Curated annotation (Swiss-Prot):
Coiled-coil spans in chain: none
Protein name per the record: Copine-1
Family listed: Belongs to the copine family.
Start and end residues of each C2 domain: 1-114, 123-245
Annotated residues for binding of Ca(2+) 3: 153, 159, 214, 216
Organism (species): Homo sapiens
Residue numbers of N6-acetyllysine PTMs: 171
Length: 537
């Protein structure tokens, strides 16, 4: 499971703080806390104190891990520091604000009003937070060939492969090993990419040793030759190096080399991350499809999967809240289309496989996750559960919007469809066709199985064992479906379902935009204060 975990740093500033000091302005400091569950908050860090300032811009950034698949609730507290003790209880509280880390990274720059307590603003005070990913996302891409390598095998030519080592801590560290090319003294190895940080520690002058060896199946590989270089020298393509065998060089005065290594391509490129796209303004458009087929059971019966408990919930709603609460932070307008399928709908009672939950086909958008919940509760008594379980219509519906977004040729939108269903899909072939077509578009499909039915067909759509194929043999361009049965998480922490089904989304989004060659949109520059007016701590 490829969780999206990376380190981000938060830059913080405030405006119009209330003054607690008599005869002067406050001396503010910001403390950052994270919700760790059970009503507890853990402190992650503090900025420096800025003296005598009501609109501080803190120079010390605060770092924390970012996880896409989790709602990371944060609390910022601003305090007027008038002593040297680390305790905050004896300092004046100037206001606080709460948000999620997802809101910060998707907003690029987030400004919130400071509150002294719920419902009581801290005057005109505001806090502004921006995030930056702490990551060297450069990769070095190379293509290398050799000429006239020494023959090492008695009954054939050599089976050469390359190894690249980085110098550090007085040792040589292996950073890349190529494939073996059998029986060839003039090989060209496959193009490869290595993170710059791993390849040379980020320093293009770091010594690099390259070894060319003859492969032996018992592990006793024979050295053909070696040379020393650096990333800076490798980039001077076409670069050519003599492959030297130290022992042969010492023994034979006439020794020249054991072949030459030629670097055909060596370039440093930026490999964009999920956060690069999100912080560049990419919107994640969230759509929900709910199964209203007869196999769910009569909603008025406590045995029905659609039965609403005395607290107004069921498995469908709990799954929706779990996933939706994470995704909603990445959609600026928080208007989500929501559909039902497999029911007879009024007024003509025809079976529909993509009816708007709010019964407004021209505007199926619901305001936030709560809006979807409200529409679902209102639709439930107005439809007749029927069948069959067809996924293709809703997948194709979302795919049409994804295709329009793709036509723009920018990394501005990505679509996520959440299907909540109680049983096996009926239109298997049509769904396969829809998923394979959608794999070429900026979208992902998440299926949550509700109830205890046999979900084997869903596992096939997940395609973790290999690419999904249509009946005609067309393969999916990438894996875009993630399926999980809800009951596997029934007794797990509430956030466990979202962590599992959303773990692959960052990789799916990045793989799509990378395949198209689309860089992130340029993020909006944070509003900067005049450095000449910045107070000193």
């Amino acid at each position: 499971m490829a969780h999206c975990v990376t380190l981000v740093q938060l830059s913080i500033s405030c405006d119009h703080l209330i003054d607690k000091d008599i005869g002067s302005k406050s001396d503010p400091l910001c403390v950052l806390l994270q919700d760790v569950g059970g009503g507890s908050w853990a402190e992650l860090g503090r900025t420096e104190r800025v003296r005598n300032c009501s609109s501080p811009e803190f120079s010390k950034t605060l770092q924390l891990e970012y996880r896409f698949e989790t709602v990371q609730k944060l609390r910022f507290g601003i305090y007027d520091i008038d002593n040297k003790t680390p305790e905050l209880r004896d300092d004046d509280f100037l206001g606080g604000a709460e948000c999620s880390l997802g809101q910060i990274v998707s907003s690029q720059v987030l400004t919130l009003p400071l509150m002294l307590k719920p419902g009581k603003p801290a005057g005109r005070g505001t806090i502004t937070v921006s995030a930056q990913e702490l990551k060297d996302n450069r990769v070095v891409t190379m293509e290398v060939e050799a000429r006239n390598l020494d023959k090492k095998d008695f009954l054939g030519k050599s089976d050469p492969f390359l190894e690249f080592f980085r110098q550090g801590d007085g040792k040589w560290h292996l950073v890349y090993r190529s494939e073996v090319i059998k029986n060839n003294l003039n090989p060209t190895w496959k193009r490869f990419s290595v993170p710059v940080q791993h390849f040379c520690g980020g320093n293009p002058s770091t010594p690099i040793q390259v070894q060319c060896s003859d492969y032996d199946s018992d592990g006793s590989h024979d050295l053909i030759g070696t040379f020393h270089t650096s990333l800076a020298q490798l980039q001077a393509v076409p670069a050519e190096f003599e492959c030297i065998h130290p022992e042969k060089q010492q023994k034979k005065k006439s020794y020249k080399n054991s072949g030459t290594i030629r670097v055909k391509i060596c370039r440093v490129e930026t490999e964009y991350s999920f956060l690069d796209y999100v912080m560049g303004g990419c919107q994640i458009n969230f759509t929900v499809g709910v199964d209203f087929t007869g196999s769910n059971g009569d909603p008025s019966s406590p045995d029905s999967l659609h039965y609403l408990s005395p607290t107004g919930v069921n498995e469908y709603l709990m799954a929706l809240w779990s996933v939706g609460s994470v995704v909603q932070d990445y959609d600026s307008d928080k208007l989500f289309p929501a559909f039902g399928f497999g029911a007879q709908v009024p007024p003509d009672w025809q079976v529909s496989h993509e009816f708007a939950l709010n019964f407004n086909p021209s505007n199926p958008y619901c305001a936030g996750i709560q809006g979807i919940v409200d529409a679902y509760r209102q639709a439930l008594p107005q439809v007749r559960l029927y069948g069959p379980t067809n996924f293709a219509p809703i997948i194709n519906h979302v795919a049409r919007f994804a295709a329009q977004a793709a036509h723009q040729g920018t990394a501005s939108q990505y679509f996520m469809l959440l299907l909540l269903t109680d049983g096996a899909v009926t239109d298997v072939e049509a769904t396969r066709e829809a998923v394979v077509r959608a794999s070429n578009l900026p979208m992902s499909v998440i299926i949550v199985g509700v109830g205890g039915a046999d979900f084997e067909a869903m596992e096939q759509l997940d395609a973790d064992g290999g690419p999904l194929h249509t009946r005609s043999g067309q393969a999916a361009a990438r894996d875009i479906v993630q399926f999980v049965p809800y009951r596997r998480f029934q007794n797990a922490p509430r956030e466990a379902l979202a962590q599992t089904v959303l773990a692959e989304v960052p990789t799916q989004l990045v793989s799509y935009f990378r395949a198209q060659g689309w860089a992130p949109l340029k993020p909006l520059p944070p509003s900067a204060k005049d450095p000449a007016q910045a107070p000193q701590a």
